[in-house]
Amino acid sequence: MQQERTVKVSKYLSKHLRHQPERIGLTPDEGGWVEIDALVAAAAAHGFPFTRQELDHVVATNDKRRFAVEGTRIRASQGHSIAVDLRLPVATPPPYLYHGTVARHLEAIRAEGLRPMNRHDVHLSPDRETATRVGARRGRPVVLPVDAATMHRDGHVFHVSANGVWLTQHVPSRYLRFPAPH
């Protein structure tokens, strides 16, 4: 499968499994799962045909493991803006997690901390490298270390998705380490 096609199918899956399943006539269950055959048929009916083999390739090769397959069903691993309950167990985070962003967001983050915005949870990375890649999608990355151990000790709840993304409702700015001003 061509890389360009892989990216297009992946973006299509993300859009319709995380944000707009109704646009192609899908109704995920409470856990965000849809039948793969229904997804493939709906995509074809709405002008974006792909095969089960292409879908399997996208799932297997996605470096961020954005999708989970269970039997005949598929869902996005996290990042939904639609109402879903991923039923992720509560997890004890490592001492530090990381958030990738860009400089233009730092003032708001200092004032409000990290908020989920249009998603259900704040997404945190387990390492600086991953957070750097996340931040780089929007420009020159800035990585903010998160004192996850102290947050957890203070009662904040963490979950970890199947693809290793750490999730929490909010990260108050007192738990963040900001870069020194230039």
Swiss-Prot record:
This is Probable RNA 2'-phosphotransferase. Disulfide bonds: none annotated. Removes the 2'-phosphate from RNA via an intermediate in which the phosphate is ADP-ribosylated by NAD followed by a presumed transesterification to release the RNA and generate ADP-ribose 1''-2''-cyclic phosphate (APPR>P). May function as an ADP-ribosylase. InterPro entries: Ptrans_KptA/Tpt1 (IPR002745), RNA_2'-PTrans_C (IPR042081), RNA_2'-PTrans_KptA (IPR022928), RNA_2'-PTrans_N (IPR042080). Its EC number is 2.7.1.-. It holds the Pfam family PTS_2-RNA. It is an enzyme of class 2 (transferase). One of its GO terms (biological process) is tRNA processing. The keyword Cytoplasm does not apply. GO terms for molecular function: NAD+ poly-ADP-ribosyltransferase activity; tRNA 2'-phosphotransferase activity.
